[in-house]
Amino acid sequence: MSRVSQARNLGKYFLLIDNMLVVLGFFVVFPLISIRFVDQMGWAALMVGIALGLRQFIQQGLGIFGGAIADRFGAKPMIVTGMLMRAAGFATMGIAHEPWLLWFSCFLSGLGGTLFDPPRSALVVKLIRPEQRGRFFSLLMMQDSAGAVTGALLGSWLLQYDFRLVCATGAVLFVLCAAFNAWLLPAWKLSTVKIPVREGMGRVMADKRFVTYVLTLAGYYMLAVQVMLMLPIMVNDIAGSPSAVKWMYAIEACLSLTLLYPIARWSEKRFRLEHRLMAGLLLMSLSMLPVGLVGNLQQLFTLICTFYIGSVIAEPARETLSASLADARARGSYMGFSRLGLAIGGAIGYIGGGWLFDMGKALQQPELPWMMLGVIGIMTFLALGWQFSHKRTPRGMLEPGA
């Protein structure tokens, strides 16, 4: 086996272990934020939505800067620093009793993510061969789902005792992850050439096709982020207990572990990437429309199942598509900018979703936020269809198996 092949194989295992620690640390804390501050402390959903939206926007909106700096200086220092900063954010969240302190903790958490997320994504593109990326992204998503339900279960159990224990556990996991990277991650460069920060960012901004694709995905993310805000609140309201939230993540884990990899393997040779992304988005959008009208957990979990199946179809295609469109000369910058759609869509989804949720309750129209989200998803579906029409997309780039 050549040294390059050996490095790729070892790199795969490193990425999987690193990803599991990050997912566990994140999901121990974040799914329970809305439960803690809205249901237990009585804050308005808008206040919590601002905090979650701020974290999302800081982490993803500034990702191009984190990616460009990583292109210049390498992945390791950025990843280690970012993970320690997120640990500090979680520790601060544990003592948050005023909205400003929650916002500050989410700001720290988001800034840490700005530093470690783009170089980690770029390492996947660097280490995984193009023909294997779709399946590897599926494996990462399966791991994400298993880690999410494990983290949510652990966090829900700890929440019975003290929210500070929840945050301390998340902080410790990110400190461990920082140590793991500091110890084992080689000083790899992310791009094929060492370019100045400004040049890497300039390459991305000049790629109009990539920029349009990323910005269009903002509507997709407005729906996706509700698994952290409105869906947990909805489950808690109907069930009358925050412990029911863990079953929502258990559903996601079961569907991902059983369906994600088989669907990715079956569809990658039969359908174009953009068609898989659009099909999943349409299913997610249609499942959102009736959520506000349900009256029991069985109906709600059925819609959540449909939403997750849509995500299982869409997510591997979205990740693979983003990676395939990236310029190898500025991988970090491209993968950082690819998070801008999540920054915009996530911030609007959290803040706008929280505001609409409060407004729907005040007007006694609980279906209002869900109808709006469904409409936004359908509009995004149509926008992607226009962008990926044959007149705009060169044939071959996004073909099955390309």
UniProtKB/Swiss-Prot annotation:
<dbReference type="GO" id="GO:0022857">
    <property type="term" value="F:transmembrane transporter activity"/>
</dbReference>
<feature type="transmembrane region" description="Helical">
    <location>
        <begin position="214"/>
        <end position="234"/>
    </location>
</feature>
<comment type="similarity">
    <text>Belongs to the major facilitator superfamily. DHA1 family. MdtH (TC 2.A.1.2.21) subfamily.</text>
</comment>
<feature type="transmembrane region" description="Helical">
    <location>
        <begin position="340"/>
        <end position="360"/>
    </location>
</feature>
<feature type="transmembrane region" description="Helical">
    <location>
        <begin position="277"/>
        <end position="297"/>
    </location>
</feature>
<keyword id="KW-0812">Transmembrane</keyword>
<dbReference type="GO" id="GO:0005886">
    <property type="term" value="C:plasma membrane"/>
</dbReference>
<feature type="transmembrane region" description="Helical">
    <location>
        <begin position="300"/>
        <end position="322"/>
    </location>
</feature>
<keyword id="KW-0997">Cell inner membrane</keyword>
<feature type="transmembrane region" description="Helical">
    <location>
        <begin position="165"/>
        <end position="185"/>
    </location>
</feature>
<dbReference type="InterPro" id="IPR020846">
    <property type="entry name" value="MFS_dom"/>
</dbReference>
<keyword id="KW-0813">Transport</keyword>
<keyword id="KW-1003">Cell membrane</keyword>
<dbReference type="Pfam" id="PF07690">
    <property type="entry name" value="MFS_1"/>
</dbReference>
<keyword id="KW-0472">Membrane</keyword>
<dbReference type="InterPro" id="IPR011701">
    <property type="entry name" value="MFS"/>
</dbReference>
<keyword id="KW-1133">Transmembrane helix</keyword>
<dbReference type="InterPro" id="IPR022855">
    <property type="entry name" value="Multidrug-R_MdtH"/>
</dbReference>
<feature type="transmembrane region" description="Helical">
    <location>
        <begin position="244"/>
        <end position="264"/>
    </location>
</feature>
<feature type="transmembrane region" description="Helical">
    <location>
        <begin position="368"/>
        <end position="388"/>
    </location>
</feature>
<feature type="transmembrane region" description="Helical">
    <location>
        <begin position="139"/>
        <end position="159"/>
    </location>
</feature>
<feature type="transmembrane region" description="Helical">
    <location>
        <begin position="13"/>
        <end position="33"/>
    </location>
</feature>
<dbReference type="InterPro" id="IPR050171">
    <property type="entry name" value="MFS_Transporters"/>
</dbReference>
<feature type="transmembrane region" description="Helical">
    <location>
        <begin position="45"/>
        <end position="65"/>
    </location>
</feature>
<feature type="transmembrane region" description="Helical">
    <location>
        <begin position="99"/>
        <end position="116"/>
    </location>
</feature>
<protein>
    <recommendedName>
        <fullName>Multidrug resistance protein MdtH</fullName>
    </recommendedName>
</protein>
<dbReference type="InterPro" id="IPR036259">
    <property type="entry name" value="MFS_trans_sf"/>
</dbReference>
